[in-house]
Regions:
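Alpha-helical junction/boundary sensor with strong preference for TPR arrays
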Residues: 47-51, 55, 94-105
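Amphipathic alpha-helical repeat scaffolds of TPR domains
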Residues: 5-31, 56-77, 104-119
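Intrinsically disordered, low-complexity regions
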Residues: 9-12, 16, 45-48, 99
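Helix-turn-helix repeat elements of alpha-solenoid scaffolds
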Residues: 33-47, 80-92
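Generic low-complexity, intrinsically disordered sequence content enriched
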Residues: 19, 41-44, 95, 114
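A generic structural signal for ordered secondary structure
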Residues: 87-98, 109, 113
């Protein structure tokens, strides 16, 4: 079970990095290949599904987990009704975790994406 918890952080960071890669595609005026875009979206969707059933070991890790999941949902083009239900569940988890004491930057990031997805 210990490796599971250690790997959660790695998975959180990987999802955040993949989302960041997608968001910054084409910044250098490079052409964006549709296949690359499709592959990144597929990776994000798979990573979301892998992380969704997980819970953080600490409040801070739970907040980082919710943040990365919500980041993934915000850019995913594979949204379906099941994903919408999962996203709503993560929003509820986020609402609960934001009531706890968290490092300010993490809380601000989580609150920002939470508000964005609710609007």
């Amino acid at each position: 079970m210990g490796t599971f918890n250690n790997s959660i952080q790695e998975k959180i960071e990987k999802l955040q990095k993949t989302v960041d890669t997608l968001l910054h595609m084409g910044e250098n005026m490079d052409c964006i290949c549709v296949d690359d875009l499709s592959l990144l979206n597929k990776e994000i969707h798979e990573q979301i599904n892998d992380l969704y059933p997980c819970h953080g070991k600490t409040a801070e890790q739970e907040a980082a987990l919710c943040l990365s999941l919500l980041m993934g949902y915000s850019v995913s083009v594979y949204a379906n009704s099941e994903d919408e239900v999962k996203k709503r569940a993560v929003l509820r988890r986020s609402q609960e975790i934001m009531k706890k004491r968290l490092p300010s930057p993490l809380k601000i990031q989580l609150h920002t994406i939470y508000d964005k997805l609710l609007s």
